[in-house]
Amino acid sequence: MNMPLHQISAIPSQDATSARVYRSKTKEKEREEQNEKTLGHSMSHSSNISKAGGSSVASAPVSSFPRTSVTPSNQDICRICHCEGDDESPLITPCRCTGSLHFVHQTCLQQWIKSSDTRCCELCKYEFIMETKLKPLRKWEKLQMTSSERRKIMCSVTFHVIAITCVVWSLYVLIDRTAEEIRQGQATGILEWPFWTKLVVVAIGFTGGLLFMYVQCKVYVQLWRRLKAYNRVIYVQNCPETSKRNIFEKPALPEPNFESKDGRGVCHSDTNSSCCTEPEDTGAEIIHV
C-alpha cells in the first residue's frame, strides 16, 4: 500500500527570525500609514472649521465687539462704590478686611451705617471706632416727617399749653382760697370740712398734672433725640491694627548706588543726557598756572 508523501522543508533558525522581524516591520508600517490617514482627515476638518470661523470673524464689524479694559489697576478703590479716593473723600481702613475689601469712603460708610443700623463690619465682625459730632445749629435740617405727624404734634403742643394754663390757674385759685380759710380758722381755732376737701382736690389735681406732663415730655424727648440723631455726623476712625500694618508694609526706598561694580567710574543719570565720569588719576602731575 503506497502512502502519500509530504515534502518537508527545513528552514534554519536565522531565516525564521528574519521573517518574523520582516513581518513586524510591515505591520508597523501599516499602522503608521493608518495613523497618518486619520491625522490627515482630522487636520483637514479643523482647517475647514477655522476657515469658516475666520470668514465669520472677518465679516463681523469691529464696532460690534465691546471694548473692555484689560490693563489691571493698582490703585485702591472703595468696596461700596468701587471708586478711587481723592482729597475731598479719602479712603479709610475701618476694619480688619484685606484685599479689595480693605478700603472704603467715609461718606459711603456713613450712609451704609445709617441704612443698615449696624455698628460692625458684616464680614469680619469688627466693631467700628466711631466718633459722633453735631452740626452747628445754623446748619441743622428739619426732621423728615409726614404731614399727619406734624399735624398731631401741633395739636398736642396746643392742647398741652392750654391744659397747663388751666391747671396753673386752678391751683392758684384753690391755694389762694385755702390760704384765706386757714387765716380765718386760725382766728376761730377750727378748720371747717370744705378746707380738707379742697386740699385733697388740689393734691390729686397736682399729681395727675405731673404724671400727664411726664408722659408727654417723654414724647418730646424722643422727638428731640430723633432731631439730634438726624443732625449728627458720624466719623469712623481707622482700625489701629490695619493702620500700623500699612505703615510697616510700606516698601523702603532703594538707596542710590554710586559705586559701579567694575570700579571704573561713577555713572550719573540725567533726563536729558547720561555721562560717565572717569576716576581721577592719582598719579597725574599738578600744573601750576
Swiss-Prot record:
Where is composition skewed (Low complexity) in this entry? Answer: 50-64
Tell me the organism.
Bos taurus (Bovine)
> Which pathway is recorded for this entry?
Protein modification; protein ubiquitination
Read off the PANTHER family from this record. LD02310P
Q: Which PROSITE patterns match?
A: ZF_RING_CH (PS51292)
Keywords annotated in UniProt: Adaptive immunity, Cytoplasmic vesicle, Endoplasmic reticulum, Endosome, Golgi apparatus, Immunity, Lysosome, Membrane, Metal-binding, Transferase, Transmembrane, Transmembrane helix, Ubl conjugation pathway, Zinc, Zinc-finger
Record-given protein name: E3 ubiquitin-protein ligase MARCHF8
For this record, the Gene Ontology CC terms, alphabetical, are: cytoplasm; early endosome membrane; endoplasmic reticulum membrane; endosome; Golgi membrane; late endosome membrane; lysosomal membrane; lysosome
Q: Which GO terms describe its biological process?
A: adaptive immune response; antigen processing and presentation of peptide antigen via MHC class II; immune response; protein polyubiquitination
Whether Transmembrane counts among this entry's keywords is: yes
Q: Where does Zn(2+) 2 bind?
A: C95, C97, C121, C124
Q: What is known of its domains?
A: The RING-CH-type zinc finger domain is required for E3 ligase activity.
